Amino acid sequence: MKSRLGKAEIIAMAVLTLALVATVVAGGCEKKEVSLAYDSSPEDLVVELRTSGGLPTPWVDGISEFKMYGDGRVIERPGGDERKPMVEGRLTPGEARALLENIRDTGFFRLKGEYANRKIMDGVTQRITVNLKEGKKEVRVYMKDVKEFATAAGFIMGYPLRDSSDYVPDKGYLLVQKSQEAPTDQPAPTEVIALLPPTADLLQAADNRKPIEISGESLVSIMKYESTQKYRGLVVKVDSGQVTVFPLYEPVVR
């Protein structure tokens, strides 16, 4: 004689079956590792760390703190110090692979796309982007403590870059503001002043509130001098008073 299962037994079996399926699926997901294969083209950006937002101060630069391209070329700001000029170097394929493995091992690829504390105003957003052959992973963090993200950012900015040299872009920018008398360092030497555009161009840039372009070589020389000074920007005397000049790789559009 066949026995009949009661309603309670059927429900219990269904729950057990679903639990077993969920366990198998979860186990499979945990075992699957992210493929770290990437395009080795020198134009392809593989890893990027970028900070944006914050109070609208004129010396905030829009350039990313770290970029690694497919051919191993790296452009970074040493130690993340915003006052230091950018440098560039190159990682071997093995070193690039090790960096990606470090990022993966932090749990970065399991993070959500965004973490934000909306209670804080005028904060900064940090973004890490990793472009691999199997897809792009981008995580943005706004004023929150996300351990995996912070660890990944630490690996990126702390990764040793051998034989680095000055990063010289094709062009740079100067943000010019009219200013009142203020504490300043010693006047810039004549060789630095000589790198600046004519006074009339500086005044026009200040009136238009638009950055003025200069050569990459001039930008780097100006930045190197400014980084040794106590105050941000170069104060330049003009007939109508003075202007403060802020050198930038990429002006921030607000």
Task: Go through the PLM ranges and name each one.
Residues 27-56, 110-254:
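Short, well-ordered, aromatic-rich surface patches in folded extracellular/luminal domains
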Residues 64-66, 87-89, 135-141:
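Short beta-strand segments
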Residues 14-23:
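Bacterial N-terminal signal peptides
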Residues 76-110:
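A short-motif feature that recognizes glycine-rich, charge-decorated loops
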